[in-house]
Amino acid sequence: MERLIIKNNKVIGKHKDKRIVEKAINQVISFFGKGKISFQIIFVKTRKEYSKFVGRKTNKWEAGFTTGNDIIYLFDKDVFEKVSTHKKQYFYSTLVHEIVHIYTYQYLWFINPIWLTEGLAYVIAKQMREIKKYKKRDITKAHYEEEWFDNPAYSTSAYFIDYLIKKYGKKKLMDLIHNLEEFEKKDAFEKKFKEVYNVSFKKLGKNFSEKSINQI
């Protein structure tokens, strides 16, 4: 296990993956335009050690997670392919994905909707190309953490964020995000979404969730 400390977007000290981490941070900041974040990355070597940090037995597809608002647990690049179902080349996108979560928690200061945080992370990390099988899930029922556990709408969330950006522009999405509370309620989100996009999220999200990958 190795620990890497980042303060105000800068990696402190030496590490074999220092440049990769700095590149990942810059990719996240570049998308949002501004912001400074401070956090730690714990590079894990074994599945047993990773599961211990998570607090349960983990699946082999799980390769990184963020806890609190300032710690990322991630399999070390040298063992990434050996201990997970992911190719070594996806170490970087997984790193970016988790840094997006740090940014949304620390700088944007919102947790709900979960589908929004996950969709953003996928889009910014350019992980949509890694989605092997698109799974239709109702993102209107993926707002709270407990809903997400029953309805982990990863691929639908990613494609919906991508759709919003391409159809309406990134500025509208940023306007929505910057107006969110930390624990945004569903009703409040629906109102804010309609103010920005002039359409009901329940309607738009539901319709989008029912489409197949070929219809998106």
Residue spans of the language-model regions?
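Acidic/histidine-rich, surface-exposed loop or edge segments in extracytoplasmic proteins
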Residues: 1-14, 77
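Active-site scaffold of zinc-dependent metalloenzymes
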Residues: 53-92, 99-106
